[in-house]
Amino acid sequence: MAIFHKKPKEREHPEQLTPWERFQRDAAENHRAAQKSHHSWSGKRLRIGDKLPKLKSQRRRLLFKRVVILMGCFLIGAGVAGYFISPLSHVQTVTVHGNDQLSVTQVKTATKINPGVALWSVIGHDQRTTKRAERAQPQIGKVTTKLVGLNSVRVTVKEIRIAGYLSTGQHYRRILENGLILKVTYSQPGGGSPIYANFKSGHRLATMIAQYAKLPSAVKHNISEIKFAPNKANPERVHLYMNDGNEVYATISTFASKMAYYPGIVAKMKTKGVINLEVGAYSYPFKNQNN
């Protein structure tokens, strides 16, 4: 006779479970929760792992960029240093332009621009070079420099024109059109510029030079001597001896404006004579001179 054991019915409510059944149920739930947490953490680790190659690639690019910058700075610094110690950074040849009264050697000496000097001390320092040149050679008014090729320098000077030579007895001193009287004395005056004689007043001489500077070049070159010759009627009278053989009487304060008529007056004269520009403008032959 078979004996059948009847399966006990599952309890429908938790409060009907025995302590052992409740323990087994809690253990099973804890196991399932642990497995779920493990799978979730593994997924996160996989996602972070996917990002690691990208981070490494970014770091490599950043490192490469820094290395390139450092190498670039080093190469630039080395190139600059190499240039400054190489012959390319020094003046190789010097050419001088614009000089008329001054020689090339005088300009080079005054500016101190000679082969061998550093280019960086010359190019871009025209104002400083001009001041240095003026102290050494007052006849230099302005200096400009230009780099030609790799290391050749073109020096252009603007001279202050010579207004003439001041007679000081047995010697002569050069006068510039800016009124400066140079200290150097000469036994003979230079050609192409007038001699200033009998000028005792510095103010009179300065005014005369300023008036002379306004004249056209053709008239300037025709004046041989300017002699201060005042009289009672005209304390500013000057007596000029011209290279063409004529003589002129004029007034210092109106000298430039009156001398502008000189070429036209001479063209109408039939013989050499005297031209008086003190009051009005008229001329007469030497035989009728009465001064």
Swiss-Prot record:
GO terms for cellular component: cell division site; plasma membrane. GO terms for biological process: FtsZ-dependent cytokinesis. It is found in: Cell membrane. Residues 1-66 are cytoplasmic. Its main location: membrane. It is a single-pass type II membrane protein. The chain crosses the membrane at residues 67-87. InterPro entries: Cell_div_FtsQ/DivIB_C (IPR005548), DivIB (IPR026580), FtsQ_DivIB (IPR050487), POTRA (IPR034746). Keywords: Cell cycle, Cell division, Cell membrane, Membrane, Transmembrane, Transmembrane helix. Residues 88-291 are extracellular. Residues 89-160 form the POTRA domain. The keyword Phosphoprotein does not apply. Pfam families: FtsQ_DivIB_C (PF03799). Cell division protein that may be involved in stabilizing or promoting the assembly of the division complex. PANTHER family: CELL DIVISION PROTEIN DIVIB, CELL DIVISION PROTEIN FTSQ. Belongs to the FtsQ/DivIB family. DivIB subfamily. This is Cell division protein DivIB. It comes from Lactiplantibacillus plantarum (strain ATCC BAA-793 / NCIMB 8826 / WCFS1) (Lactobacillus plantarum).
